[in-house]
Swiss-Prot record:
It comes from Salinispora arenicola (strain CNS-205). Mg(2+) binds at Y330, R331, A333, T357. UDP-N-acetyl-alpha-D-glucosamine binds at Q35, P36, G43, R255, K260, Q321, E343, E351. This is D-inositol 3-phosphate glycosyltransferase. It catalyses: 1D-myo-inositol 3-phosphate + UDP-N-acetyl-alpha-D-glucosamine = 1D-myo-inositol 2-acetamido-2-deoxy-alpha-D-glucopyranoside 3-phosphate + UDP + H(+). Homodimer. 1D-myo-inositol 3-phosphate binds at H29, D40, A41, G42, G43, M44, N45, K98, Y131, T155, R175. The gene is mshA.
Length: 448
């Protein structure tokens, strides 16, 4: 079952809280306008957009501040009524990696402060920053505007550095220090899972009374099992995506980076050829996504890896999928693999399960919450390709087991929804506003 929206060690929801009228959402390094699976766009983009949409439906206006990366995008974009994206010019429009952005935080902060200064006093009731770069901006803005700061880390440097993939670079000390500062200054810290809450408290010395667990959700109307006969629907989905209609398909969906470990799945396919050549002959591995920081570039190193392992004919590479094609990919797959070295939650796992597709995931971080082991999928200890190959060889031929897991996958995913996430966030927002100062008396109250 999904965790409740609870503060660490406390029960909540027993009293009405003031509801903010307007929220300033900070997302320095990635925009909800960007396609997930490309560059630095991923689950955080989905989170920000889905939360903003539902906050607006609850009559809370949201203005999302992000760094401008294209001259073709206007300074302000209305994504929907009540949700605007403000593109702040801070440094060159292109060519900057996420690691280079700290040098542009001053320019970004200036743009945020100028935008607020053009409004009537007290325009924003609360700031919600996402990722440590945004937290640094939110820290200053909260002091200038006199409003509370709610922060969601999404990933934590100390956790990533403790679980580095081979060839991955450690997060720099400057990021660790920056995260420590934001943790100390934020009025509320939103963790995706109890595991992340524990990391904030144990690794960053966060005040437990300011740490709140609010799980992400999934769009249960968009990500659904195929209607009618599953085998026929799966074949149609594969035809739509140009995948083999016969045999087994195991899909990886996400940014192509060492942390996400798509190479583990390719190496597992090679190991399966040694373990069960007949089964391996029927397997197609799909890697869907683009390299971090480079948009839609082809993942050359994975193409070369597949060639060196002799599995080129078993691996298909797809660009990030949009619209109905992403649910179609999940439905086309027999299994979705999430072999990441760390995930604060793992929205891909939740989306796949909502489509009724079992997930094989590494037993790390938030994936332990996102996937219910032996019920909605299988959690694998470690990243040894031989172990992953053994897991695939057990699951793929066993149609009865996969059918049972498919039913459990949808049931498990139904415990999560974005409406539930926003209900929890509104409670956190209300607590933060109520604790911050007398201006909360001017706001509407809600029983979340």
């Amino acid at each position: 079952m999904a965790e409740q929206h609870t503060g660490v060690g406390r029960q909540r929801g027993a009293r009405p809280w003031p509801r903010p009228r307007r929220v300033a959402t900070l997302s320095v390094h990635t925009s909800p306008l960007h396609q997930p699976g490309t560059g630095d766009a991923g689950g955080m983009n989905v989170y920000i957009l889905e939360v903003a949409r539902r906050l607006a439906e609850a009559d809370v206006e949201v203005e999302i501040f992000t760094r401008a990366t294209s001259a073709d995008v206007p300074p302000v974009v209305e994504m929907m009524p009540g949700v605007h994206v403000r593109n702040i010019i801070s440094g060159p429009l292109g060519g900057l990696t996420k690691e280079e952005l700290p040098g542009q935080l001053c320019a970004f902060t200036a743009g945020v402060l100028r935008a607020e200064a053009s409004r009537a006093a007290g325009h924003y009731d609360l700031i919600h920053s996402h990722y440590w770069l945004s937290g640094q901006v939110g820290w200053l803005a909260k002091e200038r505007w006199g409003v509370p700061l709610v922060h969601t880390a999404h990933t934590l440097a100390k956790v990533k550095n403790a679980q580095l993939a081979a060839g991955d670079r450690p997060e720099p000390k400057a990021r660790v220090i920056g995260e420590e500062q934001v943790v100390a200054e934020a009025d509320r810290l939103v963790a995706n899972t109890k595991t992340e809450a524990g990391d904030l408290i144990d690794r960053y010395d966060a005040d437990p009374t300011r740490v709140e667990v609010v799980e992400p959700g999934v769009d249960l109307a968009r990500f659904t099992p195929a209607a009618g006969d599953r085998s026929r629907a799966q074949a149609l989905a594969r035809r739509r995506l140009g995948l083999p209609e016969r045999g087994y398909v195991v899909a990886f969906v996400g940014r192509v980076q060492p942390l996400k470990a798509p190479d583990v799945l390719i190496r597992a396919a090679a190991a399966l050829r040694q373990r069960d050549p007949a089964l391996a002959e029927e397997l197609t591995v799909v890697v869907c996504g683009g390299p971090s920081g480079s948009g839609l570039d082809r993942p050359t190193h994975l193409i070369e890896l597949a060639a060196s392992l002799g599995v080129t004919d078993s691996v298909r590479f797809l660009p990030p999928q949009t619209g109905d094609d992403l649910p179609a990919l999940y439905r086309a797959a027999d299994l979705v693999a999430v072999p990441s070295y760390n995930e604060s939650f793992g929205l891909v796992a939740l989306e796949a399960q909502a489509c009724g597709t079992p997930v094989v995931a590494a037993a790390v971080g938030g994936l332990v919450t996102a996937v219910r082991d032996q019920v909605s999928g299988v959690l694998v200890d470690g990243h040894d390709p031989a172990v992953w190959a053994r897991t695939l060889s057990r699951l793929l031929p066993d149609t009865g087991l996969r059918a049972t897991l498919a039913q459990g996958a949808r049931r498990h995913a139904c415990n999560f929804s974005w409406d539930r996430t926003v209900s929890g966030l509104l409670e956190v927002y209300g607590e933060a506003v109520a604790a911050y100062g007398p201006q909360s008396s001017e706001l509407a109250t809600c029983s979340c």
